[in-house]
Curated annotation (Swiss-Prot):
Ribosomal protein is among the record's keywords: yes
Protein name according to UniProt: Large ribosomal subunit protein bL31
Classification of source organism: Bacteria, Pseudomonadati, Pseudomonadota, Alphaproteobacteria, Sphingomonadales
Organism: Sphingopyxis alaskensis (strain DSM 13593 / LMG 18877 / RB2256) (Sphingomonas alaskensis)
Keyword match RNA-binding: yes
UniProt gene name: rpmE
Signal peptide: none
Amino acid sequence: MKKDIHPDYHMITVKMTDGTEYQTRSTWGSEGDVMTLEIDPTAHPAWTGGQGRMLDSGGQVAKFNKRFGGLTLKR
């Protein structure tokens, strides 16, 4: 096996949308960083059976609706 070709794995903390946290090893960030999730399996409709709504924290849905809201399909 070649040396110094593998990424550096270190411990990070992942913070879920409900506030729970857990530690895992990752190549993301650096040792001790906190990854805050905006969407996770406890809040995403695909895993919750469609209950609840997804938060649009980046305004992407509003931006899409502003740009394409008046668009209609011609038949």
